Swiss-Prot record:
The active site is at residues 118, 145. Homodimer. InterPro entries: Aldolase_TIM, DHquinase_I, Type-I_3-dehydroquinase. This is 3-dehydroquinate dehydratase. It comes from Coxiella burnetii (strain CbuK_Q154). Pathway: Metabolic intermediate biosynthesis; chorismate biosynthesis; chorismate from D-erythrose 4-phosphate and phosphoenolpyruvate: step 3/7. It holds the Pfam family DHquinase_I. Belongs to the type-I 3-dehydroquinase family. The lineage of its organism: Bacteria, Pseudomonadati, Pseudomonadota, Gammaproteobacteria, Legionellales. Keywords: Amino-acid biosynthesis, Aromatic amino acid biosynthesis, Lyase, Schiff base. Its EC number is 4.2.1.10.
């Protein structure tokens, strides 16, 4: 049986005013948002508090470093401070990248933890992805996330294989970046993926990210086609 897709809209913005405006628009569309605070030109724990006060929906707090494909230029210690503030303020999820997971330790953990791996150059072979998955398991996260550049059909197959072979008790997000990766973004939540990400008002945070309305229309049409006809034996 196919899963009901969970769509998370990504919120970005250079200024606090722009960010809060995008957040308001996202929250009118969905019940799940990802707050990419690394896009802000300035960020501090007080701004995290302001953003939390404007957040009414389930939210992932993410402060991704430039080295991991984000915009944040601060130290791991600064990341730690921001994510710790997010935990203490009551955000539902914190996204921590695998390369810095051993440098960031959340005290008195309240939020669920997503451990992420991003590769903007290519999709590694399945053996390498499985090795990374084993490394992620050492941190005992609530959700595993893989996002890789998908340029050919083999990349799509590799990512679907990773998702389909996950343990039944594990939550996993699998995303393809680029045009070829769009099919993964659409189908992975139907095949056991924890959620998929979309954009709103053209505020895209990753290659191949699909507009929320387009994604919503796809799922509505998909379920209309796949639902059995009434009265059919």
């Amino acid at each position: 049986m196919l899963n009901t897709p969970r769509i998370c809209v990504v919120v970005i913005g250079k200024t606090l005013e722009e960010f809060l405006s995008q957040l308001e628009a996202a929250q009118t569309a969905v019940d799940f948002v990802e707050l990419r605070i690394d896009y802000l030109e300035q960020i501090n724990p007080n701004w995290v508090r302001i953003i939390k006060n404007h957040t009414q929906k389930k939210a992932i707090l993410c402060c991704r470093a430039r080295a991991d494909g984000g915009k944040f230029l601060g130290t791991p210690e600064a990341q730690q401070e921001i994510l710790q503030a997010g935990n203490d303020l009551g955000f539902d999820y914190l996204d921590i990248d695998l390369p810095v997971a051993n440098k960031i330790s959340i005290h008195e953990k309240k939020a669920k933890i997503i451990i992420s791996y991003h590769n903007f150059l290519h999709t590694p072979p399945i053996t390498e992805l499985n090795f990374l998955l084993e490394n992620m398991r050492l941190f005992n996260p609530d959700v595993f996330k893989f996002a890789t550049k998908s340029e050919q059909y083999e990349d799509v197959k590799t990512l679907f294989k990773l998702l389909i072979n996950k343990k039944n008790n594990e939550n996993m997000i699998v995303l393809g970046m680029g045009e070829q990766g769009k099919i993964i973004r659409l189908l992975s939540p139907l095949l056991g993926g924890y959620l998929t990400f979309s954009s709103i008002n053209g505020a895209i945070s990753a290659p191949g990210q699909i507009d929320f309305k387009t994604m919503q229309d796809f799922y509505q049409r998909f379920y209309k086609i796949s639902s059995p006809l009434k009265g059919e034996d």
